[in-house]
């Protein structure tokens, strides 16, 4: 796909150009790894000016010899704009480094001896994963080196579910850049669980089958795709893709009575962290920042028609740059389609006349696999002018071993001796909203009832209270279902037909609150978790809620640091950060593969339109001709 718009993701060819130019401009050698290569997105001002914009990449380089991170900007034409070292930063681990680390562990004699003591003589039957060590570093290794550690499972046959057979208490710690095992934790005598956990169709047979469900649109889908630009119903927006965040949405507009109206400049999920709540060996370090320490875009699946997506599908490919500078295309990285979504609205009048409209929604989605878990990111656009984000969590729960029936208060026993530790999935959406263009403010709205008396004579009356969140400290808020609390982003400079500021409201969905103590290692590193809402002025460099480089960072970066300045939020260009997620207490029904669990939020127009946009939806042709709809 050729370049058509400044917000288009960098293509395969463009990334190859960037890599070649960067090597030349910055004298990069084999020990310099491409940790991240991202589109350096133009500013709103640059986009509005309408002038030619150089295609520029933000490139993150890890120097394995010096153990330093450097960042640079460089264009597809080879113009290097800057290149600077980032003191104290450590880059995400690339797939190439993970492969090297695993090879180092597999060749280590101490690891082989430890496995042999457990009855495993063939190391090729051992599955290992590379996990960031976080900041839980043994004191003798806490000298600035870049470390990963390797949980292990036994895979007795090539098609066995290795997560059914955790090798408890055995972990290698690897210095990634020195390519050596610098620590071996071998401190448990728990037997390897032996009950298999088959899930492949060839193993389970799939005994419950339904009749085939076909989705057929004889005239094709109702959306139009031009490059990365999408038009559907009255919506228009751009799809983006980022090596760190994965699926991104840009430039969201809704046409109202013939006029396109801006709703958002950029929408993304800027971080995903999974705090594990089990202090057992093999669990307490598992607090991965899947976005910031791995780069979700790297793990994007190639989607399959009829399995991942169903209907009249249009796919978009994506490209990512590997650590050694090779560029990899991910076929069918993003899926787009329409879904019937039941009744949009309906009313039966007293004379029996029925008006009903079926609803439809546009779906843009991608799915990533990070070790044991799959995460589906789904953005939905509705005919009533609302937007929804839904994360679909599935895959295989992480497993540990303990004695059958043991007292293990922070885990669920799935099979005799096989345990799944309690954990949370905490996501942070970064939403650069632009309600009807221009500057915005944020209002908190709560419902309350007066005491029974003059204002509430019958005891059933209630009102709403609106509070403008004027500063960053005032805008650090929690969900409160008792007060039906929600937040509305308004444009105070534009009024609707009844004199109120137009806006969109954020409605939290299924959410949770972090159980890790604030002063814990994780609590410091993921300080953004402790508010469901943050609001900041829009600053280009403030992109990730835990900071740019969470790998082995001790904490304090990102939202907690930026908001110390307590900047004003009134009538300015703002960014909304929404923290949400799930508290996962595993069930036996989550084994061997977890059914999808959902979490997310809605953005709904509130005083933005004169009336319901759903009134403009045409009636569907009734299948039963005796029914008038």
Question: Where do the model's predicted regions map?
Answer:
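Extended effector regions of multi-domain proteins
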Residues: 1, 15, 76-93, 116-118, ...
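Hydrophobic or amphipathic alpha-helical targeting/insertion segments
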Residues: 66-99, 103-113
């Amino acid at each position: 796909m050729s370049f058509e718009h400044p917000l288009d993701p960098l293509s395969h060819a463009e990334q190859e150009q960037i890599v070649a130019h960067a090597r030349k401009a910055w004298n990069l050698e084999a020990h310099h790894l491409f940790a991240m290569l991202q589109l350096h997105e133009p500013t709103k001002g640059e986009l509005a000016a309408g002038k030619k914009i150089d295609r520029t990449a933000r490139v993150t380089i890890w120097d394995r010899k010096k153990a330093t991170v450097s960042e640079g900007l460089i264009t597809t034409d080879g113009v290097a704009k800057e290149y600077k070292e980032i003191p104290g930063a450590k880059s995400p681990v690339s797939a190439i480094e993970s492969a090297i680390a695993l090879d180092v562990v597999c060749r280590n004699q101490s690891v082989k001896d430890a496995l042999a003591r457990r009855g495993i003589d063939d190391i090729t039957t051992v599955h290992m994963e590379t996990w960031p060590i976080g900041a839980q570093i043994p004191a003798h290794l806490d000298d600035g080196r870049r470390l990963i550690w390797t949980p292990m499972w036994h895979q007795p046959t090539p098609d066995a579910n290795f997560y059914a057979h955790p090798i408890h208490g055995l972990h290698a710690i690897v210095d990634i850049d020195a390519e050596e095992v610098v620590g071996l934790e071998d401190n448990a005598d728990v037997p390897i669980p032996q009950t298999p956990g088959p899930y492949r169709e060839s193993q389970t047979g799939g005994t419950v089958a339904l009749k085939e469900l076909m989705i057929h649109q004889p005239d094709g889908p109702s959306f139009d795709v031009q490059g990365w630009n999408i038009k559907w119903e009255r919506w228009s927006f751009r799809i983006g893709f980022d090596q760190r965040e994965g699926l991104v949405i840009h430039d969201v507009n809704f046409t109202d009575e013939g006029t396109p109206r801006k709703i958002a400049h950029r929408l993304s999920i800027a971080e995903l962290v999974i705090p594990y709540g089990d202090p057992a060996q093999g669990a307490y370090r598992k607090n991965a920042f899947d976005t910031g320490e791995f780069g979700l875009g790297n793990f994007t699946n190639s989607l399959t028609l009829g399995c991942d997506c169903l209907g009249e599908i249009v796919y978009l490919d994506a490209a990512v740059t590997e650590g050694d500078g090779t560029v990899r295309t991910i076929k069918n990285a993003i899926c787009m389609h329409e879904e019937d979504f039941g009744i949009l609205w309906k009313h039966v009048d007293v004379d029996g006349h029925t008006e009903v409209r079926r609803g439809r929604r546009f779906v843009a989605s991608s799915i990533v696999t990070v070790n044991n878990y799959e995460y589906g990111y789904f953005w939905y656009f509705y005919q009533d002018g609302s937007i929804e984000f839904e994360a679909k969590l599935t895959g295989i729960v992480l497993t540990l071993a303990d004695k059958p029936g043991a007292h293990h208060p922070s885990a669920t026993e799935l099979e005799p001796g096989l345990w799944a530790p309690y954990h949370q999935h905490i996501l942070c959406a970064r939403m650069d909203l632009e309600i009807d263009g221009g500057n915005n403010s944020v209002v908190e709205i709560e419902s309350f009832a007066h005491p029974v008396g003059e204002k509430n004579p019958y005891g059933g009356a209630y009102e709403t209270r609106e509070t403008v969140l004027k500063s960053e400290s005032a805008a650090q808020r929690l969900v409160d279902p008792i007060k039906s609390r929600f937040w509305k982003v308004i444009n105070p400079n534009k009024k609707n037909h009844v004199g109120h500021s137009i806006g969109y409201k954020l409605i939290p969905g299924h959410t949770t609150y972090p159980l890790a103590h604030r002063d814990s290692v994780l609590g410091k590193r993921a300080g953004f978790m402790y508010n469901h809402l943050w609001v900041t002025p829009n600053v280009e460099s403030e992109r990730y809620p835990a900071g740019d480089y969470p790998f082995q960072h001790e904490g304090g970066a990102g939202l907690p640091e930026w908001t110390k300045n307590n900047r004003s939020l009134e009538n300015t260009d703002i960014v909304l950060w929404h923290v949400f997620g799930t508290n996962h207490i595993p069930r036996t029904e989550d084994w061997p593969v977890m059914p999808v669990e959902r979490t997310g939020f809605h953005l709904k127009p509130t005083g933005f339109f004169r009336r319901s946009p759903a009134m403009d939806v045409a009636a569907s042709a009734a299948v039963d001709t005796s029914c008038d709809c």
